[in-house]
Amino acid sequence: CGLYKSKAEKIKSTSEKICNEYNGEVPDNLGDLTKLPGVGRKTANVVLSNAFGQDAMAVDTHVFRVSNRIGIVDTQTPEKTEFALMDAIPKKRWSHSHHLLIFHGRRICKARKPECEICPITKYNRVKNRRTKCQ
């Protein structure tokens, strides 16, 4: 069932690589983190933000959906969304914004049946004088 074997193998190989190549210390930069097996930009940015307190913009399914739906960005991929959000949001607010977008996506701006009628953003958001996709 599922990808548990694959995930377990990646966790094991990542742990070995951290022990062998990084003296048991989790890397604190995007380049080294993304060299670890199974670690992409999203995971690396979450680690940088949550474990190391660095400014980072992690784009998961909620961040991607919400930021595109409400018109902060107009992108087709998580990576393009990450860079567009980094341009649109002051660096000191990246990590906090990431968490707020996730929360909003889970509670109000859901993938199916978004609750636009109670969305506090919809009525105020105007990007380049265009209405949001919810309106």
Regions found by a protein language model. Give the residues of each.
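Catalytic cores of DNA base-excision repair glycosylases
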Residues: 1-133
